[in-house]
Amino acid sequence: YNGLLEVYVTGFPTIHSSNNNYPVPQIMLPAQIGEVTESELVQIDNAIFVSGGSLFSGNNTYDFTSGGQSGKIYIRSNHPLIGLTIPVGPISLIGISSQYTFSVPAIDGYQILPRDTNDLIIPSGLIITSAVTQSNITSTGFDLTWITSDSSTTEANYAVSQPLTIHVNGNSYTKAHTITLTGLQPATFYFVECFSVNGTDTAFSNVGYYSTASNSTGKIRPYFNHSVDNSVSLGVDAQNITIYFNDTIKAYMDRADSTIDICVYNASDATIATAINDAYNRGVNVRYIADDDVVNSMLNSLNPNIPVVYRDPSVQGIMHNKFVIIDAHSENNSWIMSGSTNWTNPSNLFNDYNNLIFIQDQALAKAYTLEFNEMWSGVFGSNKSDNTPHKFNVNGIEIELYFSPSDNTTSKINEVIKNVNYSLEFALLSFTRDDLA
């Protein structure tokens, strides 16, 4: 099952020998890991983790690249690596070749299982010892900072697409590096690889994906369907709109000029269905992604020409998003809708305590569109990649955006918890992560 082999031993096993030496790991590239290597010890050199600088958490996979190929490791619950920093630069990665898949036949899902901290071998010499951090985000540039083990140069290669053809030199020889990218375009995403040189030794970061700020208004509008207490508000006051949740969603859809992308777990509301059909009838390009394992009765009321993609049922999990993207490529009419609300009437829209958040920001809308397009192409769950920028400057407010499971959301939440000084408040329907507890 799941590409795994279960061995059941009747009675007591026979020990033929013990205290044997471990086999020498086989050095290979990620693409060579497969059926013929399962249960064998393998080694990947020059492996660079996509999420370098974050923290390892249990029951999670982590993507890496080596030699232009991609691979995954899996960290089980209670693993010795949990809570430790994910290496930033190239390492030698050792582990047991394994597989976990829901595909039939089982021809994918290959991964490496590191046994302990000794299976991540950090090379001697110059290395990057911190995550690359983005700051001072403007519509024309941003700063990137990192730390190295020894004094070295401050450099980066970047471009809007790979290969990274533009080189910038920070002209500083130090351990604490800051480089500034300037002359960039608003609401535009850039691939950046930071690196430092000391003599003949060079340390590279993973290739990061970063966004400039947009020139949008940055309006943020939170709504709740039950009472709110604005006396404790520290920002934009929330509004209690009670029975008008569906009507509010419709009102924003009515603003769309060119595109509406909808990604919602479950829906059964006639008012919202009417808004979607009206948008399609006036020439708006509408796309809809839904989960495959719930009723979604509202979809029967949509114009049959509106394309709908259901989550791939062969991949474990559910598609639990609730977001809408309106006119993503418009500076002033781009909106994203997020929040906790499914579109089920009356349960989620009116009875259960839920919220909606609308943000007018082109950069955020374009990032949500990247995630939408990945799922629109049929990629869901553990097959997704960490392919969006994560930090945004929305009219002076820093917003971070992560999608699960590809973006190591548990690790990001854990980092926030570890940095809490005085109080932590959260509102959740379900809480099952022991590592966060």
Task: Give the label of every model feature segment.
Residues 1-125:
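OB-fold nucleic-acid-binding modules
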Residues 29-65, 248, 255, 259, ...:
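Surface-exposed interaction/gating patches
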Residues 46, 95, 260, 323, ...:
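A residue-level signal for conserved active-site and pocket-lining positions in enzyme catalytic cores
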Residues 48-51, 98-103, 151, 161-164, ...:
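Acidic glycine-/aspartate-rich tracts in secreted/extracellular proteins
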Residues 104-106, 200-206, 348-350:
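Beta-sandwich strand segments
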Residues 124-214:
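Short, surface-exposed linear motifs at loops/turns and structural transition points
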Residues 214-255, 263-418, 434:
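HKD-type phospholipase D/PLD-like phosphodiesterase module
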